[in-house]
């Protein structure tokens, strides 16, 4: 068993949760998770983050013919879908150019005090457009540096049992519940920030089983990355499954407006939580495939890290990029253009070069059991070579959050002088499925297995 050098803080018991939303307001965790609807998840094999990101070059194995049938099922109106595709491509022209010109100015930095009193209308508009935000000043710098020192001591005390990736020189540590991590997850500034960010989501279905102002604790890993090139690179991707976005009926309903075709994609609401609650993100039960619903992914900085120092990269474009990613599998480059496109820069972006194809079973960038890869070949219209930008400099204690659908990556090289370190701490609400996840997370923790 891993050794912990200090006594852990007392954590509150699993009492009934009473949030501002209906659904869970009158039910305890026990009442929710004992239903047949939320049977225990199967125990996953142990693995590392490296295995999860193996397909980020965009190469995918062939899909069986049933996936062509799935495309036909989703495309109810060919003309409407073609109209939506052309409209999305047109808007992408201006949106990608804006990011190419402004760079990481598109990534908003706000002081913690703004979060405490509520963001302004202008700030909210920017956040919902870009899907990413840095919160500064909530955690004192020395406190965050103390967490990092505690993590180093924990690693040293358990050296023979520590796992991670790369295996010979670990950067991503498969450690989930050290003292420092629990202290960070329960820090008042993090909880307050998460409550606010979760409150930006809403329900479209009455009596939805969710409390959007009740954050729960999700056990995630941390990273301590020394200067130098990365052994493996986390290229551009979207977390929360890949082919599941289309294959799982509940997950597919999230993009209902986009798949309707025509101009309905403009009505897609990236902050409607209702259709996401029953979505299955891990149909293939893969190691390190997250099965909890995280509206906001996030990390808390443990170092001074800026562009070029192994930091996060994002595509600061939320709903428009999502609409494109959802529509992309239904279209292919016309044969006369495909034969001439020997490199990503040769791929024509004009709508007339693309054609609706429902006979092709392929889903570009998708691999069962992996994350959704985004490359210049699989998704050329996003122009990720110019639009995926490194976030501005962060200091120890700064919080970074990005929408669950946002395209993001990690810099391949770390050219700074010190380590680039973060604790991964997302904003996760109390829902019925997430309540069941907490039950299973507790069980796997007690058995010494990774989180489900």
Predicted regions span which residues?
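Fe(II)/2-oxoglutarate
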Residues: 2-129, 159
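Non-heme Fe(II) oxygenase catalytic core, chiefly the N-lobe of the double-stranded beta-helix
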Residues: 41-42, 122, 127-130, 139-376, ...
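Hydrophobic beta-strand signal
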Residues: 134, 401-402, 424
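Short, charged beta-turn/beta-strand-edge "cap" motif at the junction between a beta-strand
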Residues: 402-409, 413
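C-terminal catalytic subdomain
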Residues: 407, 422-426, 440
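Double-stranded beta-helix
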Residues: 428-452
């Amino acid at each position: 068993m891993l050794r912990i050098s200090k006594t852990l803080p007392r954590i509150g018991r699993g009492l009934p949760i009473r949030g501002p939303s209906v659904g869970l307001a009158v039910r305890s965790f026990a009442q929710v998770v004992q239903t047949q609807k939320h049977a225990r998840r199967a125990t996953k094999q142990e693995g590392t983050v490296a295995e999860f990101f193996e397909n980020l070059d965009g190469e995918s194995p062939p899909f069986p013919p049933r996936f062509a049938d799935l495309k036909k099922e989703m495309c109810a109106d060919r003309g409407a879908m073609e109209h939506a595709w052309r409209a999305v491509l047109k808007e992408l022209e201006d949106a990608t150019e804006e990011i190419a010109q402004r760079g990481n100015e598109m990534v908003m930095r706000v002081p913690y005090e703004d979060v405490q009193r509520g963001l302004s209308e202008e700030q909210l508009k920017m956040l919902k457009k870009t899907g990413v935000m840095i919160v500064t000043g909530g955690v004192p710098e020395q406190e965050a540096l103390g967490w990092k020192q505690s993590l180093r001591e924990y690693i040293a005390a358990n050296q023979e049992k520590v796992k991670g990736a790369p295996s010979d020189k670990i950067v991503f540590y498969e450690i989930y519940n050290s003292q420092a991590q629990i202290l960070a997850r329960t820090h008042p500034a993090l909880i307050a920030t998460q409550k606010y960010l979760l409150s930006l989501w809403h329900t479209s279905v009455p009596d939805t089983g969710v409390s959007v102002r009740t954050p729960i604790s999700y056990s995630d890993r941390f990273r301590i990355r020394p200067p130098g090139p990365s052994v493996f690179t986390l290229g551009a991707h979207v977390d929360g499954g890949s082919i599941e976005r289309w294959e799982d009926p509940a997950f597919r309903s999230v993009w209902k407006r986009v798949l309707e075709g025509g101009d309905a994609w403009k009505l897609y609401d990236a902050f409607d939580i209702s259709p996401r609650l029953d979505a299955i993100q891990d149909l293939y039960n893969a190691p390190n495939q997250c099965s909890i619903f995280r509206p906001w992914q996030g990390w808390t900085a443990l170092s001074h890290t800026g562009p070029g120092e192994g930091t996060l990269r994002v595509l600061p474009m939320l709903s428009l990029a999502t609409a494109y990613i959802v529509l992309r599998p239904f279209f292919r480059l016309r044969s006369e253009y495909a034969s001439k496109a020997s490199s990503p820069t040769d791929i024509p972006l004009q709508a007339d070069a693309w054609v609706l194809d429902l006979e092709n079973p392929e889903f570009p960038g998708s691999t069962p059991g992996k994350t959704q890869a985004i490359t210049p070949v699989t998704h050329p219209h996003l122009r990720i070579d110019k639009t995926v930008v490194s976030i501005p400099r962060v200091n120890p204690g700064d919080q970074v959050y990005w929408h669950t659908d946002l395209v993001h990556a990690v810099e391949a090289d770390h050219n700074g002088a010190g380590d680039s370190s973060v604790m991964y701490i997302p904003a996760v609400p109390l829902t019925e499925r997430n309540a069941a996840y907490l039950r299973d997370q507790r069980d796997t923790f007690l058995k010494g297995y990774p989180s489900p």
